[in-house]
Amino acid sequence: GEVEKYNVFQEPEHGYKEQVFYLDIPAVKDNCSYAAIFNRKLKLGVYVKFDREAFTNFSEWKMMGEGEYVVGMEPATARPEGRKKARENGELIMLKPEEKKVYTFEIGVFEDEKSLGGI
């Protein structure tokens, strides 16, 4: 099925239907997780590194269609199904009046697969 192909990026496909994959990415170092895509032909990659405790969910949005070839790597505090569903799942974060919450993450590029381990 398609679930096993979440990390496969094929040629653009006519009629491809966009998909969202929910990934449980474990913390690797300093409670951070990361996701990356690397194009061996172009020798170019992009990564997102995030605090696993703050960002409890991660979605990969994938569209491999002709003229619409894109992927989104999306750390989040809830799944992208809306506030109602987040409330039902106990994931909706409510801030008190004037309360602030800061979330940080890192996005970067790399040119060598081996350098990914140093992120």
Where are these regions (language model features)?
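Active-site/ligand-binding surface loops and adjacent short beta/alpha elements
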Residues: G1-Y47
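Active-site pocket scaffolds in enzymes
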Residues: A36-I119
